[in-house]
């Protein structure tokens, strides 16, 4: 018999999903746009205030980009207060959110694998967590601890489809990823394969 008949390993993507890469990039670019707009409105307002209080504006030769900002403000650009200030505020929030999101992607929080090993008679559930004491979540159980495989399907706006590993002592361990639920067909297929592989009952379907 080949290795597949003794060992099954299911990989969990975690935070490194395409949708997370997409939204983290969009928010980062958008926040930069807000910040640049707010900063440019502040520079333009400062230049205008300086020009009004100084009689030597005509004798000054401003750098090209500063003069462009001044001219844009005089032709209908936003004022720093309150519009520009709000732009800076929302841009800063968006930037911090995108940095946090990129950190989650870099750490791959929630990613890992489930290994079912008949050859050595153990089940291993591995997940990456946040940096610190619980960075690695590595759980081991024996195959004898498994009583059944249970599938939970919650319909609605935030639909959830989860496979649970039911252990002795009424313990249940979720073994599917969070944030990107599998389709009903994928859940049924994976749960059935796992129940047949472990030779335990399947509940919830």
Swiss-Prot record:
Record flagged with keyword Membrane: yes
Keywords for the protein's UniProt record, in alphabetical order: Chloroplast, Membrane, Photosynthesis, Plastid, Thylakoid, Transmembrane, Transmembrane helix
Subcellular location: Plastid, Chloroplast thylakoid membrane
Any one Gene Ontology BP term: photosynthesis
Residue spans crossing the bilayer: 23-43, 86-106
Entry GO CC: chloroplast thylakoid membrane; photosystem I
UniProt topology in membrane: Multi-pass membrane protein
InterPro entries linked: PSI_Ycf4_assembly
Known function: Seems to be required for the assembly of the photosystem I complex.
PANTHER family: PHOTOSYSTEM I ASSEMBLY PROTEIN YCF4, PTHR33288
Entry's family note: Belongs to the Ycf4 family.
Name of this protein: Photosystem I assembly protein Ycf4
Taxonomic placement: Eukaryota, Viridiplantae, Chlorophyta, core chlorophytes, Chlorophyceae
Gene symbol of the encoding locus: ycf4
């Amino acid at each position: 018999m080949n290795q597949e008949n003794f060992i099954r390993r299911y990989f969990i993507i975690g935070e490194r999903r395409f949708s997370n890469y997409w939204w983290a990039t969009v928010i980062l670019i958008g926040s930069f746009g807000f910040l640049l707009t707010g900063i440019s409105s502040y520079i333009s307002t400062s230049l205008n205030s300086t020009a009004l209080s100084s009689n030597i504006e005509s004798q000054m030769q401003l750098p090209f980009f500063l003069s462009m900002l001044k001219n844009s403000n005089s032709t209908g650009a936003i004022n720093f207060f309150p519009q520009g200030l709000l732009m800076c505020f929302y841009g800063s929030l968006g930037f911090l959110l995108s940095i946090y999101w990129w950190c989650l992607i870099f750490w791959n929080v929630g990613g890992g694998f489930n290994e079912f090993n008949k050859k050595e008679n153990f089940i291993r559930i591995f997940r990456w967590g946040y940096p610190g004491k619980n960075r690695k979540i590595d759980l081991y159980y024996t195959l004898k601890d498994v009583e059944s495989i249970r599938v939970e399907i919650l319909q609605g706006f935030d639909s959830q489809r989860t496979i649970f590993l039911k252990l002795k002592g009424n313990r249940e361990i979720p073994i599917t990823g969070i944030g990107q639920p599998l389709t009903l067909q994928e859940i049924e297929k994976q749960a059935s394969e796992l129940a047949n592989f472990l030779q335990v009952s399947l509940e919830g379907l």
